[in-house]
Amino acid sequence: MGDYTGYELTIIPSQLISFDQFREAYPDAAVLSRETGHLRNYGNNPYAGYDDINNSPFLLREELPKKISPMEKVIGVRTEKQVKGYTYTITRKKRVIHDEVGGEPIVIFHVDGMASALDDRTIHRSRDDGSTGVFSPVLNDEHLEFEFSGGEIRDKKTGSIWSISGRATDGPLKDAQLVTKIYGDYFAFAWLVFYPETEMFER
C-alpha cells in the first residue's frame, strides 16, 4: 500500500555467529554496549525450550506446504530464479554442501560453536546449534571445492583453512575472502509461509 508498493529494499548479507567467531573474524569491530540504561539480563532466555523440534509454534494456523517439522531450522537461500531450503539436520551432518540455486553456485558451511538462543533459560548452557555461512565458491574466477577435514573447512586445491565468515585463515590463500550470498537462518514455519515454493535440499 502506498507510493512504493511493489518495491523491495536491498538486503545486506549477514550471519548468525558466536561472539568468539565474530571477534576472531573482525578484531577491530565495534560492539554495542550492554549498558543501555535499562535493566535487562541479555544472557537469559524467556522462551526456554521454544525451539524444540517437536514443538508447534504458537499462533501458527497455516499448514506447512512441505513435510517438515515447523520448528526445524533451515537455511533459506533466494535468487531471482529459485528459492531453496537446507535443514540444519542435513547441514550439521555434512558440514560443507556444494549446490546451485537458480543456476548460481553456492557453498554452505556449518560449524559448531554457537549456542541456541531459545533452548535453555540460561543461553550459555543451551545446546550448540552451530553457525552457518553461504558463499560463492568462485574466487578470482576460479571455482573452489571445499571439504570438512580434521575438524576444519579446507579447499581441496590448496588445503587452505577457511573460517565460518568465509575468510581463509591459514594456507596459500590466507586472507582471501569469499563473497557472502543472500541467505538467512529461520524456523521452517517462518520461511515456508513466505516462500511456499521453496525446494528443499534432500541429498
Where do the language-model regions lie?
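Mid-to-C-terminal functional-domain signal that highlights helix-capping/loop sites
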Residues: 1-203
